[in-house]
A protein has these predicted regions:
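Extracellular, repeat-based ectodomains that mediate carbohydrate processing or recognition
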Residues: 1-233
Length: 233
């Protein structure tokens, strides 16, 4: 976990790459891992990751931006602490300067919830995180299973994630927010097969709100990639 985050860009369609620049701005040999990268509609790059620079039992969630297409990186910003150590972060953007970061946060009693923090100023600052599904999943280790997000043209934010909830049954859920990440709808379970293990969901959302969610579905003797589609937001 002792890593440094670096970013390299190509200006010739991927034929060559320029020398990399450091993303994390602390000098310590410490965890900077499970990163995510997103480009918004105006060309800003948004990066999120799990960062152990404070030396606490649980690391924090950090973000940074590039305002010049990857040539330089802004000062790092701590969004929150108490982050699950190995569930990858996710970052995306929406209309009117909205930026969203998702991760799995550890609450008292080893309750692990998927949360989203929002920025209303293109990622300069972030508000306190909001719990998405209220799963109340107690798990005394890191599940290694991240969330995934997407936003449609009207600004609806969609989140998909894995949890085992209070019944300890593996499941993939989706929820959405129509108030720019202040609150979330009731969650909806996506996987319907019995005696399988749904894993690592990913979502893609087009501007009109057509949604595709894919995940791995493991059975005792095989592993499939399963897809769920919505055409009506």
């Amino acid at each position: 976990f002792a890593t440094e985050l670096r970013l390299s860009r190509s200006t010739d369609g991927g034929k060559t790459f320029q020398p990399s620049v450091a993303v994390n701005d602390d000098p310590g040999v410490i965890q900077h891992t499970f990163d995510a990268l997103h480009r918004d509609a105006d060309g800003r790059l948004h990066l999120s990751w799990i960062d152990g620079r404070e030396g606490k039992k649980e690391p924090g969630t950090y973000v940074a931006r590039s305002l010049d297409r990857g040539a330089t990186i802004t000062k790092n910003l701590k969004v929150d602490e108490g982050t699950c150590v190995c569930c990858r972060t996710a970052v995306t953007s929406g209309p009117e300067g909205m930026v969203y970061v998702a991760w799995r946060k550890i609450f008292e009693g080893n309750v692990r919830e998927t949360v989203v923090a929002r920025s209303t100023d293109h990622g300069e600052t972030f508000e306190a995180p909001v719990i998405v599904g209220h799963d109340r999943w107690v798990f005394p280790a890191c599940p290694h299973r991240p969330a995934s997000m997407g936003v449609d043209r009207q600004g609806r934010l969609y989140v998909v994630w894995y949890t085992e909830g209070t019944d300890e049954i593996p499941a993939v859920y989706i929820a959405y927010s129509d108030d720019r990440g202040k609150s979330f709808s009731e969650k909806r379970k996506l996987n319907v097969s019995k005696n399988t293990f749904p894993d690592h969901p990913q979502i893609a959302v087009d501007p009109e709100g057509r949604i595709v969610v894919v995940w791995e579905e493991q059975a005792p003797v095989k592993r499939d990639v399963v897809m769920s589609v919505s055409m009506d937001r």
